[in-house]
Amino acid sequence: MDLHIAGRKAIVCASSQGLGKACALSLSREGAKVFINGRHEDKLRATAEEISRETGHAVVPVVADIMTDEGRAKLVAACPDADILVNNNAGPTPGKFEDWDHAAYIAVFEQNFLPAALLIRALLPGMRQRQFGRIVNITSAMVKSPRAHQGLSTAARTALTALCKAISTEAVVDNVTINNLLPERIDSPRQQYLIERQAKMDNIPVEAARQKLTDTIAAKRFGRPEEFADMCTYLCSEQASFICGQNIQLDGGSYRGIV
């Protein structure tokens, strides 16, 4: 299937590793010119070269911290006419409600709400004017299945979800869609960090902690980053123009709800 992405310009945030990198690779395979982003120049340039070698398409590394006004401005300046925006950033460390103070809430909104919201604000008008745009926010399964220890992440990502639902109803008339991908149990560096953290808390080997978590997944395996990334790429296609304002779970069937 031709997704009609070839030649499109795509910004993928926090894409030197993990799910961001997987999404950048998938989009590049379809012929998009991808602008990848991260804070560490050497790592980012190596990722750009790796993806470009594999796909044969140009990949532009933009070293910038998207949690700052200067970083966001630099990223937008590198690709002011982006057709595709994939919002992504690392999540906060799990913890306890009673330990989260005012500073913790401010920090998580500056990490998982404001960068995406302000990048959308910068790029959405141009997308609407050109009559094409695809915005995908990588959020979290915690949006639909909140857990106490992930309360900080849930608060910020749910706020982003609500904002994007509101603005998506206006943007879609100009062929601009905004959707959210909700990963859970995808085999990424973030997931490995959480496994190692749990192993330490439970005083068990890392592999035992990994198996314990695997047993909770309906599919009895972790998701592959490329599976997640290919869904992201489909949402950026011409064919996905009637999918808008949705929260799409990628969790191996583990979500217990029906809506």
Give residue ranges: language-model regions.
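Alpha-helical segment proximal to the catalytic Tyr-Lys
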Residues: P125, T169-E170, S241
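Conserved NAD(P)H cofactor-binding loop of Rossmann-fold oxidoreductase domains
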Residues: N88-P94, G253
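Substrate-binding pocket helix/loop in short-chain dehydrogenase/reductase
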Residues: K96-E98, A104-F109, L213
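Short C-terminal tail/terminal secondary-structure segment
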Residues: S145, T233, C244-V259
